[in-house]
Amino acid sequence: MRLTSIAVSMVLAALAGAARAGSEDEVKAVFAKFVAAQNAHDLKAVGDLLQGSPQFLWITRGAPIWGRDAALKRFEALYQGTWSLDPKTDEMKVVELQPNVAQLYVPVTFMIAPAGQTAQPARFLLNQVLVKTDAGWKISSILPIPAAQP
C-alpha cells in the first residue's frame, strides 16, 4: 500500500511538472505572437492577446493605462512613429504564480520615436502577467521597467 502511494505521488508530481512545462511553452508562444503583432503594428492581433477587462493594466512612461481599449488607443498612437521591440529570448523566464497565472520576464530593446524623428534604443526589463482563460492565455498586465545602461 505504501509503495502504491509513493508511485501515485511520483506520477502526480511528474504530471504537474509536465503541465508547468506545457504552460511555460504556451506563455512563451503568446509572447512571440505579441512581439510579432507589435512589430507589425497590428492592433487587432495585439488586442486579441490582451485580456478584455477594465482591470488590464499597462504602465507606460510612469503612467497607468487601465483597460484593453485604452491600451489599444495608446498603441495606435505609438504606431504612427517608430515602435518595435527586440526581446532577448535567451534570458526569458516564465514563473507560474498559481495554476493558470504566469509571470513572464524578458529584457527587451525598444526602438521608439514619434513620426519623422530618429528612434533611439531604450532597454527595459519587461514583465507581463498572463492569465489562462477559456480562449487561451491572455496578457493581463504589461510592466516595463527601465534597465540600467551597460
Over which residues does each language-model region extend?
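Short beta-strand edge/turn micro-motifs at domain boundaries
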Residues: 123-150
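A short hydrophobic beta-strand element
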Residues: 100-110
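Short, surface-exposed coil-to-beta transition loops
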Residues: 87-89, 105-107, 120-127
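A solvent-exposed, acidic/Ser-Thr-rich amphipathic alpha-helical stretch
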Residues: 25, 43-97, 121
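A short, structured loop/turn motif at beta-sheet edges
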Residues: 94-102, 130-136
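Short, cysteine-centered beta-strand-loop-beta hairpins and adjacent loop/turn segments enriched
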Residues: 82, 110-120, 148
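Bacterial N-terminal signal peptides that target proteins for export
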Residues: 1-8
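Short, low-complexity N-terminal intrinsically disordered segments enriched in polar/charged residues
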Residues: 11-12, 16-49, 150
